[in-house]
């Protein structure tokens, strides 16, 4: 979502913006599937916000008219042992600080940002292939769209991609220093190697049995599970993080993994859980706009924030807005917000606008000349 937010801020400052998106949708790692009535989207990417820790995200949600509700946790929690024996914990699994979810699904956030791009040209299915410093100091952006190669020229470019994709999917001319390129290739993309299974049901039947919908398992294939229903429980669902590493998932038939997950849901929540109305398996390691082969290795720890410093010939021409470049909460929604705001602030300072970066709910009346165009490419952005 960092590319969308950056484009929104730039448009409000009066910049001409072209947003290039490699996918056929916006949002990057923010992705959900719609309920039948379209009133809710079930998250297959990031789902949680922690207001005490994510103040900028909360500010933007408020500005965009989006509300939060607390993750359902009332009722007993379940623990599945390696033997597949299930133990019930009456007190459940309290989350501190409480995890909150966006009413309607996290994709409502990216939908709202997209809807506010009035003058920005948005090109979907447009994959940036290369960046060139032009003799006049502008940046040439080579892209591929519909099997055709194209190019545009921008005064500055904001890149809303994780470090690994910047290093492995883009041609840079002049080339990046080998040390920087290697450092980016070694930087894990948060949650890129993970997979998430979502099962939809007519009702949240587990609640009637006194269960919270939360479980942890040492048997698998799902390692951690939660209630994924909407705030009212009218759109019922369970989701689980797949505990099988990406390399192991590649050796499994997709349907075999789904079948094993449904059997596990039956062990945990009863026979009704085995036959959902619909089931979705989102394997982020298979998304080339998110993951590289290096992301198949499980993360040993949360990635540290990445430096945004660039060599002199790219400095002030390229600005990095991927969530992994955020000073705090890299990889999360909050990181995406912070990285986008910082990148736009740096670009604004570079181009000499006297306008102050507008925060949530603020506007600016001054505008740069239309000739000052800024390209913002987002092929993958967002949170964990």
Segments (PLM) and residue ranges:
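Conserved flavin/dinucleotide-binding core of flavoenzymes
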Residues: 4-5, 13, 85-94, 138, ...
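Short beta-strand to alpha-helix junction loop
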Residues: 47-54, 94-114, 123, 253
């Amino acid at each position: 979502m960092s590319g969308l937010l950056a484009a929104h801020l730039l448009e409000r400052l009066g910049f001409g913006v072209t947003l290039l998106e490699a996918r056929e949708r916006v949002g990057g790692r923010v992705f959900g599937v719609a309920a039948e009535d379209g009133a809710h989207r079930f998250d297959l990417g990031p789902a949680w916000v922690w207001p005490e820790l994510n103040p900028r995200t909360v500010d933007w949600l408020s500005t965009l008219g989006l509300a939060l509700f607390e993750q359902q946790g009332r009722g007993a929690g379940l623990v599945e042992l390696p033997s597949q024996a299930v133990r019930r914990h009456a007190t459940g699994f309290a989350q501190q600080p409480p995890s909150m979810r966006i009413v309607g699904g996290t994709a409502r956030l990216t939908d709202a940002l997209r809807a506010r791009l009035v003058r920005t040209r948005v090109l979907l299915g447009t994959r940036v292939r290369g960046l060139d410093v032009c003799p006049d100091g502008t940046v040439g952006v080579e892209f591929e769209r519909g099997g055709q190669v194209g190019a545009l020229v921008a005064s500055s470019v904001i890149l809303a991609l994780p470090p690994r994709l910047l290093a492995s999917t883009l041609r840079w001319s002049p080339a990046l220093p080998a040390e920087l390129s290697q450092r980016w290739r070694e930087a894990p993309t948060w949650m890129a190697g993970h997979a998430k299974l979502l099962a939809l049901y007519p009702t949240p039947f587990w609640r009637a049995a006194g269960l919270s919908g939360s479980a942890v398992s040492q048997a698998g294939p799902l390692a951690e599970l939660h209630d994924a229903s909407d705030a009212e429980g009218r759109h019922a669902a369970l989701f689980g993080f797949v505990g099988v590493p990406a390399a192991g998932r590649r050796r499994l038939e997709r349907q075999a993994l789904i079948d094993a997950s449904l059997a596990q849901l039956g062990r945990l929540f009863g026979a009704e859980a085995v036959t959902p109305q619909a089931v979705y398996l989102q394997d982020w390691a298979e998304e080339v706009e998110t993951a590289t082969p290096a992301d198949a290795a499980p993360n040993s720890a949360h990635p540290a924030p990445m430096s945004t410093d660039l060599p002199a010939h790219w400095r002030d021409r390229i600005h990095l807005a991927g969530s992994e470049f955020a000073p705090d909460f890299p990889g999360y929604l909050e990181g995406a917000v912070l990285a986008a705001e910082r990148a736009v602030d740096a670009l604004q300072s570079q181009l000499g606008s006297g306008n102050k970066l507008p925060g949530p709910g603020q506007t600016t009346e001054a505008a740069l000349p239309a000739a000052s165009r800024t390209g913002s490419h987002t092929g993958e952005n967002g949170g964990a």
